[in-house]
């Protein structure tokens, strides 16, 4: 609060001095006299550093008698703080996320971040593929959505190729919707409707849940960092124009990198034990990172199996509904298909502050309770 008041007080002094100058000189004086881009950008402050932590907050127990024995329950409440280097995208059509886009720092964890709507200077975007091509970057006269989109299309047109079906493979147990959100890199409050609808938990208490993520990154598009603050903006933009979008706790940020590709999120549910589910997942997906092959027979052996899938990118539709064990071959065929570069969708993006180009972490701070109940005869 002290910092915020100080910023406002300085702003009053600047305006007052400008009024005095106008009255005494009786000539047009720029409203931004005495204010620099650096001062405005510094007023936004920096994101407080933090470390990944998982702390046990509370433990309670209860026992409920039933005809066959007692339900003994343990409720554990956890607080988790987690930071990732990139921000995930579950809506490929989000129009404000592209290399070079200026965003308001306080809105980065919103479903759609708020923009800094000032006229931009020129900029350069490039692809990270090393293939001997002489057309891996494009310089645009103004950084804006339409010109950047055309630049990216031009780069892809000159560097298009078929990508082999190589994936990264991750899996973890998720016991609550909050743990699912953490695994997806999202705050619970902004989990997209498609995720809620397609990866909803079974209401049966006997079911165990595993999230499997198969991600294939095609390429990353990067925005060249401008050498000075003024190079971010068109010459017509003044520091006062920028100050409308910057305030203490709301620094100006920009998208430095966007990674494109395809990804499959599988929520695997079964009444089998966690140990059996994990073993089946490891065997089923052991070849997926290299060839995209899925040995569905091991998953099919699980009891009361349900597989819910979201697929983004490639030649697939944006989402799949739940599939049964007998339909796993469809997923197997989809994973094994190679994909063109032009079939990639934005999967994640990296954000930096304009003031000092520091990376901004995707901060997740979630508290949740796990209910673990066992029937004791």
Roles of regions detected by a PLM:
Residues 32-377:
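Membrane-permeabilization and membrane-interfacing ectodomains
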């Amino acid at each position: 609060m002290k910092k915020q008041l100080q910023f406002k007080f300085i702003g009053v002094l600047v305006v007052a001095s400008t009024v005095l100058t106008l009255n005494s000189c009786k000539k047009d004086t720029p409203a931004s006299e005495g204010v620099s881009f650096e001062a405005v950008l510094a007023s936004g402050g920096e994101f407080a550093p933090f470390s990944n932590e998982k702390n046990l907050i509370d433990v309670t127990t209860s026992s409920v008698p039933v005809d066959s024995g007692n339900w003994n329950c343990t409720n554990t409440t956890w607080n988790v703080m987690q930071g990732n280097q990139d921000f995930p995208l579950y809506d490929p059509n989000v129009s404000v996320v592209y290399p070079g886009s200026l965003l308001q720092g306080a809105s980065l964890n919103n479903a759609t971040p708020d923009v800094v709507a000032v006229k931009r200077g020129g900029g350069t975007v490039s692809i990270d593929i090393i293939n001997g091509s002489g057309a891996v970057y494009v310089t645009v006269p103004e950084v804006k959505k339409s010109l950047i989109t055309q630049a990216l299309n031009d780069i892809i047109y000159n560097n298009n190729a078929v990508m082999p079906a190589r994936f990264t493979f991750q899996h973890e147990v998720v016991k609550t919707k909050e743990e699912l959100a953490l695994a997806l890199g999202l705050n619970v409050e902004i989990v997209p409707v498609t995720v809620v609808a397609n990866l909803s938990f079974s209401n049966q208490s006997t079911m165990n849940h595993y999230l499997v993520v198969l991600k294939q990154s095609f390429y990353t598009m990067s925005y060249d960092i401008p050498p000075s603050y003024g190079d971010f903006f068109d010459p017509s933009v003044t520091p006062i124009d920028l100050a409308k979008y910057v305030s203490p706790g709301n620094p100006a940020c920009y998208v430095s990198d966007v990674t494109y590709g395809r990804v499959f999120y599988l929520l695997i549910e079964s009444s089998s034990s966690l140990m059996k589910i994990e073993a089946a997942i490891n065997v089923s997906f052991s070849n997926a990172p290299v060839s995209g092959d899925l040995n569905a027979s091991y998953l099919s052996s699980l009891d009361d199996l349900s597989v819910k899938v979201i697929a983004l990118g490639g030649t697939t539709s944006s989402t799949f509904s739940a599939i049964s064990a007998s339909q796993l071959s469809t997923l197997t065929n989809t994973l094994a298909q190679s994909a063109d570069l032009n079939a990639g969708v934005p999967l994640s993006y990296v954000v930096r502050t304009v003031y000092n180009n520091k990376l901004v972490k995707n901060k997740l701070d979630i508290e949740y309770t796990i209910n673990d109940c066992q029937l004791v005869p």
